[in-house]
Regions:
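Pyridoxal 5′-phosphate
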Residues: 1-381
Length: 381
């Protein structure tokens, strides 16, 4: 049975050129910190890759630190910036809709005397009026808000967030989890993280790279404290011998995710949603935030629990998810609940992640499988 894969928001279908680069670069074994010619060659590969990833961010190469992925990048930024900016206050502001690597790190900081304030995020977009109120009433060291929600794709306007912060005169720093939004926003918004944030995190395997590689953007002139010790690699921010093959593959994936790929994903999304509404009618609920990335959307089959739908879809070779993969073992979807969707929707929620490597034919099979899951529930009622 062939696999029809629409869980690209958990881990995307690999970019073939990126896999090719990974395979070739894995043969280059010299340590990039070594001073002989082989080591210097490996170092050049990393720096060339850094330039390509920086181009995706629209920033300078020296602002990019390579990590093991989005979770490490978020941990490094949230903990590091809170510590660095402790003089401004002890309050970290975020939302319950954030990725677990942000929420858990913020809560862990409470053991060090920090306070976590969760502002509302209806529909996955933070309440900026509440943010303003907190900034005016508390001593905030860090605001951390994702650019694109990993459950429904809702996009947060980082320019407006920065505007609220500037208007209050806060000394807080701003971090954004850009794992889902990186390369997936229109050109006019592609540089927002660099223009308005002090740091931003991304992950290679969400854009067609390989797992185990990510990057952290850090504003020029801002010294990010290291999360670990034991080496001076990556400007001292991330010690340890670099994952050369993963880094080079990430750069290749960045180079192959552009306007054409975004346009294809947008067309596939529209096709799937139109097909679902035409064929399932009132039996499907689809969330479409006013401003969103096209690579994912959240939906529910009415009166079909997520696990029932997932089991049926898996039996016919279709892969989707019901939540962020990093929180898939949780009994409830805290992120969706915090966004105001309600318990009934939450129990039936499915996340569809679309890749430029998906096809229209696969979209037809996805819709047919979802239709089959609904019929399976009705038949077994």
């Amino acid at each position: 049975m062939n696999t029809i894969y629409f869980d690209n928001s958990a881990s995307a279908i690999p970019c073939p050129p990126a896999l090719g680069v990974f395979a070739e670069t894995a043969k280059i074994y010299a340590n990039p910190s070594s001073l002989h010619s082989a080591g210097l060659h490996t170092r050049r590969l990393i720096e060339d890759a850094r330039a390509k990833v920086a181009a995706g961010f629209r920033c300078q190469s020296e602002s990019i630190t390579f990590t093991s992925g989005g979770t490490e990048s978020n941990n490094t930024a949230v903990r590091g910036l809170a510590h660095k900016n402790r003089r401004a206050g002890n309050v970290v502001v975020t939302t319950r809709a954030e990725h677990p690597s942000v929420v858990s790190t913020a809560l862990a900081l409470e053991r060090e005397g920090y306070e976590t304030v969760f502002i509302a995020s209806p529909g996955g977009v933070p309440d900026l009026n509440e943010l303003e109120s907190v900034l005016k009433s508390k001593k905030v060291c860090l605001v951390t808000l994702m650019q694109a929600n990993n459950q429904n794709g809702a996009v947060t306007d980082l320019k407006k967030v920065r505007g609220v912060m500037d208007s209050t005169g806060t000394g807080a720093l701003l971090h954004s989890d850009c794992v889902q939004s990186f390369l997936k926003l229109p050109d006019e918004s592609a540089s927002d993280a660099v223009r308005f944030c002090d740091s931003a995190s991304v992950s290679a395997h969400k854009i067609g790279g390989v797992k185990g590689t990510g990057a952290l953007y850090v504003r020029k002139g801002l010294a990010m404290p290291a999360l670990m010790t034991g080496g001076e690699q990556e400007n001292g921010v991330r010690p340890g011998t670099e994952n050369v093959a993963g880094i080079c593959a990430m750069a290749e994936a960045v180079a192959h995710y552009g306007a054409a790929e975004r346009a294809k994903v947008a067309k596939l999304r529209e096709y799937v949603i139109d097909s679902l509404r035409a064929q399932l009618g009132e039996n499907v609920v689809i969330t479409e935030p006013p401003r969103h990335i096209d690579s994912l959307f959240n939906m529910a089959l009415v009166n079909v629990k997520s696990e029932v739908a997932l089991n049926y879809l898996n039996s016919v070779g279709v892969c989707v998810s019901s939540s962020s993969a990093c929180s898939s073992k949780a009994k409830t979807n805290a992120a969706l609940a915090s966004m105001g969707y309600g318990a009934e929707y939450e129990r039936s929620a499915l996340r569809i992640g679309i890749s430029p490597y998906n096809t229209k034919e696969e979209c037809d099979l996805l819709v047919a499988a979802l239709k089959g899951a609904l019929a399976f529930r009705i038949k077994g009622k």
